[in-house]
């Protein structure tokens, strides 16, 4: 696999390991294995696995797996919270400080590119906006109009709303995208950004890149396994809370389709196929995003990943 990593440092030990990759590529299992071998702490770097209500449908580590080594930032946020990248960075900073204070290797594992980017580059003054947030805001713009979104912006970012005319469609949408994606106003981002948590030359960063067809087959099989493990009941409990459908937890892959099934709109088989297709499309986007946004990550097959990490971290710390 191609790719370079500024943190390789002639085989020296890294201050932290970053394990990224598309959904269902084996990141959690690799992180668990590495943590057991090194006495490390696994730190969640996935925007959906932070939610307490969604263990099954987001493929969080099982309670047994979490008991084997310390896990942080898994299921620590309620579904009624919009956990922004800025909130995650603050939580990740505390988890990183804990790991280093205990002389444990911090192992960041997940699939959220913006979170990994924040670790080694910080959050920029004008952060990249996830396509899901952007598409949602643009759909609301078409449905409700610029003046309605301007009223929403006045509550979320009053300073930006005051600067913008109520019919300035593009700038209103941009300001609202930023505050909804990050939890910080565009005004704040223009003033300052968040610094990186880790020096890029002191980390070992890999991207698990399985064979595409094998990955898609695994995604399809895993969705069926989730249903067998109780994913529908998990989503039913979430639906009974009657939360805002625009909250991130309500849009996790598989959740909207299963909620449609619970409302009697589609069959369970149709919901499962929609969930599988959405997850496959997400995996494709993850490949593309990491290739262009974080080229310093070393791409490797899951089979080669253990050896890649063993070269840098030969034994317990």
From Swiss-Prot:
Quaternary state and interactors: Monomer.
Organism the protein comes from: Nitrobacter hamburgensis (strain DSM 10229 / NCIMB 13809 / X14)
Residues engaged in binding ATP: 21-28
Molecular function terms from GO: ATP binding; tRNA dimethylallyltransferase activity
GO BP annotations, alphabetical order: tRNA modification
Top-level taxon: Bacteria
Reaction(s) catalysed by this chain's protein: adenosine(37) in tRNA + dimethylallyl diphosphate = N(6)-dimethylallyladenosine(37) in tRNA + diphosphate
Stated name of the protein: tRNA dimethylallyltransferase
Lineage, broadest ranks: Bacteria, Pseudomonadati, Pseudomonadota, Alphaproteobacteria, Hyphomicrobiales
GN (gene name): miaA
Enzyme Commission number(s): 2.5.1.75
InterPro entries named among the record's database cross-references: Dimethylallyltransferase, IPT, P-loop_NTPase
Gene3D superfamilies per UniProt: 1.10.20.140, P-loop containing nucleotide triphosphate hydrolases
């Amino acid at each position: 696999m191609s790719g370079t990593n500024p943190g390789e440092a002639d085989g020296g030990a890294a201050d932290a390991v970053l394990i990224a990759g598309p959904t269902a590529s084996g990141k959690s299992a690799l992180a668990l294995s590495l943590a057991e071998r090194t006495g490390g702490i696994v730190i969640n770097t996935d925007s959906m696995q932070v939610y307490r209500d969604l263990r099954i449908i987001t493929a969080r580590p099982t309670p047994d797996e979490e008991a084997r080594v310390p896990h942080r930032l898994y299921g620590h946020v309620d579904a009624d919270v919009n956990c922004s990248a800025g909130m995650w960075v603050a939580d990740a900073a505390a988890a990183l400080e804990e790991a280093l204070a205990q002389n444990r290797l911090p192992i960041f594992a997940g699939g959220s590119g913006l979170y990994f980017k924040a670790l080694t580059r910080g959050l920029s003054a004008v952060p990249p906006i996830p396509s899901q947030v952007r598409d949602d805001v643009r759909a609301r713009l078409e449905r409700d109009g610029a003046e309605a979104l301007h009223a929403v912006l006045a509550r979320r970012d009053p300073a930006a709303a005051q600067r913008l005319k109520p019919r300035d469609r593009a700038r209103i949408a941009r300001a609202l995208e930023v505050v909804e994606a990050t939890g910080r106003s565009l005004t704040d981002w223009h003033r300052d950004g968040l610094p990186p948590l880790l020096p890029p030359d002191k980390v070992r960063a890999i991207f698990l890149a399985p064979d595409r067809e094998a990955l898609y087959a695994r995604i399809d099989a895993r969705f069926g396994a989730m249903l067998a493990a109780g994913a529908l009941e998990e989503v039913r409990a979430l639906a009974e809370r009657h939360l805002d459908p625009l909250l991130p937890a309500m849009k996790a892959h598989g959740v909207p389709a299963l909620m449609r099934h619970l409302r009697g709109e589609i069959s369970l088989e149709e919901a499962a196929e929609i969930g599988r297709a959405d997850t496959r499309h997400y995996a494709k986007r993850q490949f593309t995003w990491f290739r262009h946004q974080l080229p310093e990550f070393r791409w490797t097959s899951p089979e080669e990943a253990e050896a890649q990490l063993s070269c840098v971290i030969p034994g317990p710390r």
